[in-house]
């Protein structure tokens, strides 16, 4: 009952942000911290130029199970199985042990996996200090979505240059923001058409199985209010008990690890997540 009450409170908090009183409302936050991209989340509504209605966007619900939670010894088999169970994308967390403390897999593992799932959509989340070094290797393994952290870049010009390099290499561009980074820090890149997706982390990146941080969902609401047709991905602690908070805020691309791979019925787990997104976004 206590968790249900907390979920209801957060949903009430987030819903007004995602459904701002006017279509041209934009949500801004202030209180700047040390990083050029990090801003805390004191929320203020500000008027912007004409925008489309906030929650009427054309992107369908996309479920991207994280292979960080699969059995690494059976990665190919479990990748095939999770696709058969209804997964839209495969989420691959590449960590270098420097940008985040954990170390996972890189291009050689993805190259080995690709022949087993030749048609799969590789949704690669790079938690690395030098994402530019990964553009060519990830393109070679036919990565579809190349998502890097703005916190790993020196500034806006560096982000824009990297976005262009990723596009030139034939991949879609995703930018990720950690819990301490504001949604506003990536708006300029979306406005300029440089970005296909924004990944909002709802846990600190680096390890799977963490608890969902509902305050981070407000950033999805900020982005959805400004960009009705943007792919907004949420990653961290997503499960049937938290999916509706993220979906009502505007997330339509859902990363789920343990809630899928730790379930006895992967099809049912994926269907439940998809239904949670569709409830608010279709």
Regions found by a protein language model. Name each.
Residues 133-137, 143-222, 226:
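Conserved anion-binding
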Residues 148-153, 202-208, 250-269:
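Glycine-rich phosphate-binding active-site loops on the catalytic face of alpha/beta enzymes
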């Amino acid at each position: 009952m206590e968790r249900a009450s907390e979920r209801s409170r957060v949903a009430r908090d987030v819903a007004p942000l995602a459904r701002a009183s006017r279509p041209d409302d934009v949500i801004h936050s202030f209180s700047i911290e040390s990083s050029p991209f990090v801003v805390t989340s004191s929320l203020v509504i500000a008027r912007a130029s004409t925008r489309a209605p906030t929650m009427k966007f054309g992107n369908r619900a996309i479920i991207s199970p994280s292979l960080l939670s699969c059995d690494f010894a059976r990665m190919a088999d479990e990748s095939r199985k999770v696709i058969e169970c209804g997964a839209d994308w495969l989420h691959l967390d590449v960590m270098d042990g420097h940008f985040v403390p954990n170390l996972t897999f890189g291009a050689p593992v993805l190259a080995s996996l690709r022949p087993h799932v030749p048609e799969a959509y590789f949704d690669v989340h790079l938690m690395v200090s030098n994402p530019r070094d990964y553009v060519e290797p990830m393109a070679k393994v036919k990565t579809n979505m190349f998502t890097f952290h703005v916190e790993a870049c020196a500034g806006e010009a560096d982000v824009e240059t990297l976005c262009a390099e990723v596009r030139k290499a034939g991949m879609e561009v995703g930018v990720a923001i950690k819990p301490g980074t504001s949604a506003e820090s990536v708006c300029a890149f979306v406005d300029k058409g440089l970005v296909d997706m924004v990944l909002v982390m709802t846990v600190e990146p680096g390890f799977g199985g963490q608890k969902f941080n509902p305050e981070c969902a407000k950033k999805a609401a900020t982005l959805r209010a400004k960009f009705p047709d943007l792919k907004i991905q949420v990653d961290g602690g997503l499960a049937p008990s938290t999916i509706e908070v993220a979906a009502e805020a505007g997330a339509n691309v859902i990363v789920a690890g343990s809630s899928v791979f730790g379930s006895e019925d992967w099809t049912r787990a994926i269907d439940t997540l998809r239904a949670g997104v569709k409830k608010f976004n279709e």
